Amino acid sequence: RMGIGDMVIFLPFIEAISKSFKIPVSILVKENSKAIQFLRENKTINQIIILDRNNKNKSGRHDGIIGAYNLAKDLKKYNFNKIFIFNSSFRFNLIAKIARIKGIHQYPLFNKKNQHIIDAAKNFIKKELNIETESNPQIAINDKLVKNSKFNYKINHEEVNILLGVGGSGPTKRIPSKIFINFMKLVTQKYKCRFFLATGKDVEEQKILHEILNTQYKDKCIALDDLSLSEILPVIKNCDISICNDSSFSHLSSGLGIKTIVLMADTPLLYGSYSTKMFPIIPDGEITVKHNTLGKEKINPNTIFEQFNKIFN
């Protein structure tokens, strides 16, 4: 699976396997899943093995035919007895066999089309382990790190500490700065607030960040873009509520148990609604959202504020 969001979504299913066999498990993930940075406190995961595949130029150690052999050779060293493959790829099935893993559990082969990311995983775990799994991921975090973060950032719960996840992996997911700024105007009229701004280093993400910082609210803002993900997590855990684009921060925030308003502009609604901690907002005039909805300009700051009030009160 590709990124942070996918990694968070699959956590309950990984944990179900661990609990079924009463041992921690190893996971094979891509580096951009950032699993090493946010799963270090997860007691059901023993080892994080990095899948070295480069989708752009196919130059990774595990790319191509030779890469498949390399991966099989790498996995063989661990002497795994079982493998659970959360996709329908024949390639991974063959790799598991070459690695001499006897117990191969996998989605139905060649059945990727229109595959529901959550339902497919639920059905898989039910079929293989007879376990009903709730899609409600939880990310474990060290309490000491949370306390240190609270001290370092002088976080005071007499004011409302709000995470604003203003970044996003693609331009159609990034809600314009004016919408966040208008929300900030509304919320500061009623509440005493601090805003923690989470984003990446992409040029367009930085533009949105600096447009927000170049407002009357700049003294109420703390930018988190120079921190590593593992440094950001304790800050998020100290927040009272989050408002995030459909991005890694919406998944991480909800996984940390923070009620998260997810601004859904251009991806299927399930990515912003699979957790009980998620409260999706869709563009004005739409009854749902999916790929190519292209609705980022139609996210209404008044609707965000209304949802904020419902949650916070």
Each language-model region and where it sits:
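Catalytic machinery of carbohydrate-active enzymes
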Residues: 1-313
